[in-house]
Amino acid sequence: LTSEKIFSACANRIRSLSSFISTNDLLCAAKLICEARICHIIGAGNTIPIASDLGFRLQRNGQSCMYSSLPEQYFNNIALGDSSDLVIAISRSGASTQVLKALSLAKKKEMKILVITADPNSQIMDFSDAILQINDTNEMHDQNVRADSHLLELAVNDALIYVIKNYPLFNFDDKLPTQINDVELL
C-alpha cells in the first residue's frame, strides 16, 4: 500500500459520484439553496463537520445558513423557520434519529428538503424534495481496509459551491437570485 494507491483510490471514489449525481441534480440542488430564505444544514455524528463546512462556505458566498452540532439548536432553528426555508440533511445511513426528527418538523413547517445520503432505501428519502445520492464502498482498491471517510460528502459540498458560483456557465435561461454574489468575502 503506497501513498499513490491511497490517493488514487480517493480520486476514483470521487470520480464515481458522477454515476449517481447528474448535472441536473446539482443544478436542482443549487436552485433550492439559492431560492431559500435560510438554509438549515443538519447532520449527526460524523456528518456534523460536513454540515458545518457546507454552512460556512454557503455563508461566505452570500446564502443565509444555520447549522449547529447540537440537535436542540437545529430543532429550535427549524421550529422558528417558515416554508421559504430549506433543510439540507446530511446522513450517510439515512437513519440518524435526530436528523429524522428534524425533517419531520421541517415537513410540518412545509420547508423544502435536500438530502445527501448513501442509502436510497432509507427512511430519510420519505422527506426529500431533492436527493444527492452518494454510493461508496469506502474501501481501498485490492485491500480489505475500510477508510472511515466522508470524502464524498465533502466532494458534494465542493460541487454545490462550484455550481452555485458558476451557474451562468451552464447556459440556462434560469437565473439564480443575485444575493449569492453580494457578500464581500472577508
Which functions belong to the PLM regions below?
Residues L1-D25:
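HTH-adjacent hinge/linker in prokaryotic transcriptional regulators
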Residues C10-R13, L17, A29-L32, L54, ...:
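A ubiquitous structural signal for well-ordered alpha-helices
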Residues R13, L17, V163, K175, ...:
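Residues that form generic nucleotide/phosphate-binding pockets
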Residues L17, I21-N24, H40, N171, ...:
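Short secondary-structure junctions and interdomain/linker hinges
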Residues N24-A36:
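Glycine-rich phosphate/diphosphate-binding loops that line cofactor/substrate pockets in enzymes
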Residues C34-L169:
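Glycine-rich phosphate-binding loops that contact phosphosugars or nucleotide phosphates
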Residues N166-L186:
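A short, charged, Gly/Pro-tolerant segment at domain boundaries
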